[in-house]
């Protein structure tokens, strides 16, 4: 009798599991889809954790209150220019989850996005960097990648874009990144980023 009861309970439990609809893994994101909006914001989908190159020469303040473009904070980076790892270049990848170089299934389907928009400013002006997304290869890899090309910052906030036309955005593991070479700023540099977002029309994630 007990075996029969256990069997009936097992059948009931299995029927409940089968009745739960499967999550649609093909669902696309809603836009604007923020990489960074404010330090600690729940709307941030990526984390500036992938320090690379001469990573020992990079300092970051993810909740900088020094004149953010919008909201309460921006993210501040300082690169001293020192060849701490002997490479003469440095950068930071915004990853999901933190420190994910393709070992964890953390990519987002951003199909439908038309461009990445973001605001940047330099502490002195004249700072030379390249901004990009994608580029992580591993057990889990980015489906695409693109770049802004070389950018020279000004002291005032300025909006920049990375076009996404013809990009495969079905799996975006690195939502954003910056890189620079020591030769571009031998004395180092400090710069600020804010309102980094994927958008799907002619508009953008502008400051409110």
Tell what function each PLM region has:
Residues 8-17:
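Bacterial N-terminal signal peptides
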Residues 22-208:
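Beta-rich carbohydrate-recognition modules and glycan-binding surfaces
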Residues 5-6, 19, 124:
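Sequence-pattern detector for short linear motifs
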Residues 1-9:
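Bacterial N-terminal signal peptides that target proteins for export
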């Amino acid at each position: 009798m007990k075996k029969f009861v256990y069997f009936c309970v097992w059948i009931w439990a299995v029927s409940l599991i089968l009745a739960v609809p499967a999550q649609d893994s093909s669902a696309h994101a809603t836009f604007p889809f923020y990489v960074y909006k404010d330090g600690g914001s729940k709307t941030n989908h990526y984390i500036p954790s992938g320090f690379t190159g001469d990573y020992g020469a990079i300092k970051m303040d993810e909740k900088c209150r020094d004149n953010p473009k919008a909201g309460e904070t921006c993210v501040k980076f300082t690169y001293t220019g020192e060849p701490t790892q002997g490479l003469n270049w440095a950068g930071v990848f915004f990853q999901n989850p933190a420190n994910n170089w393709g070992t964890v299934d953390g990519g987002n389907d951003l199909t439908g996005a038309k461009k990445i928009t973001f605001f940047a400013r330099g502490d002195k002006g004249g700072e030379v960097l390249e901004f990009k997304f994608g580029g992580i290869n591993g057990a889990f890899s980015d489906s695409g990648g693109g770049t802004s090309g070389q950018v020279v910052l000004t002291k005032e906030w300025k909006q920049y874009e990375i076009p996404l036309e013809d990009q495969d955005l079905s799996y975006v593991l690195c939502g954003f990144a910056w890189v620079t070479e020591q030769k571009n700023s031998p004395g180092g540099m400090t710069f600020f980023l804010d309102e980094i977002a994927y958008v799907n029309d002619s508009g953008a994630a502008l400051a409110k």
